[in-house]
């Protein structure tokens, strides 16, 4: 298990990105959080198997919704954190 901090920019606020990311994370059995940042980015903290996290990032970049346009997605490994589930932070 590992935990990654994922920063996503583009047209990702006000278009259902957090909801879509949460749904995808739950389908992939990832745990963590997703929240909007003041600078227009979305921050995701996700814990799971390495291959599953890679799949999650690939699917975030392509195909969540026609209204979502991911311009950049960066990942950084951070100390492993256990979450009970995956949720949106408001």
Swiss-Prot record:
Which Pfam families does the protein's record reference? Acylphosphatase (PF00708)
What GO molecular function annotations does the UniProt record carry, in alphabetical order? Answer: acylphosphatase activity
Q: Which InterPro entries match?
A: Acylphosphatase, Acylphosphatase-like_dom, Acylphosphatase-like_dom_sf, Acylphosphatase_CS
**Active site residues according to the UniProt entry:** 18, 36
* EC identifiers of the protein: 3.6.1.7
Keywords carried by this UniProt record: Hydrolase
Q: Which residues form the Acylphosphatase-like domain?
A: 3-90
**Chemical reaction(s) catalysed:** an acyl phosphate + H2O = a carboxylate + phosphate + H(+)
First-tier enzyme category under EC: hydrolase
PROSITE patterns recorded for this chain?
Answer: ACYLPHOSPHATASE_1 (PS00150), ACYLPHOSPHATASE_3 (PS51160)
Q: Which residues form a coiled coil?
A: none
Q: In this UniProt entry, which cysteines form S-S bonds?
A: none
Family named by the database record: Belongs to the acylphosphatase family.
Name the UniProt record assigns to this protein: Acylphosphatase
Recorded source organism is Levilactobacillus brevis (strain ATCC 367 / BCRC 12310 / CIP 105137 / JCM 1170 / LMG 11437 / NCIMB 947 / NCTC 947)
Q: Which gene encodes it?
A: acyP
């Amino acid at each position: 298990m590992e935990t990654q901090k994922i920063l996503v920019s583009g047209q990702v606020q006000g278009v259902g990105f957090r909801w879509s990311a949460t749904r995808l994370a739950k389908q992939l059995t990832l745990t963590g959080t997703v929240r909007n940042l003041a600078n227009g980015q979305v921050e995701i903290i996700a814990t799971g198997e390495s291959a599953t996290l890679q799949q999650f990032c690939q699917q975030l970049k392509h195909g969540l919704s026609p209204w979502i346009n991911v311009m950049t997605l960066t990942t950084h490994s951070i100390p492993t954190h256990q979450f009970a589930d995956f949720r949106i932070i408001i």
